[in-house]
């Protein structure tokens, strides 16, 4: 469900100005899976997912590869570098993005957008740091990464380790854990989680 929702909303990704957003959806009964990308930063084919969902997909594939709870941390780190690091389309677009930052931003990057937390994570993994998560931004990457792990039924207490692979921002950690507590309550049948 989360993957479909991400893909459906992705053409409107990162449009923060409400007037601009209203302009893009005006007169539309349904604005899921918009044909034309409206994201101001990057453009990918409609139906493709954002980097937030992609990091969750990387965890999902890591779990398929190795379900041993002790090994999943190293498998996940390896797969983050493989999916987002040097040689990937994400990394190629990061190089283009750095070029655009030096001059006036004129156009969207064609292809996926790598997030700050993922860039920091890759750098920290390559430096063999024990703490790999990004610290510069408060985003949902850690939550998205840990969602498949949580849904597989792993220990609730070990979620922080998974989230921290991608972010160690205190705000990101708190929000992610709060979301997991709400999901946990809902899964257990709480009337009003």
Spans of model-derived segments:
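Structured, active/binding-site neighborhoods that engage oxygen-rich ligands
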Residues: 1-193
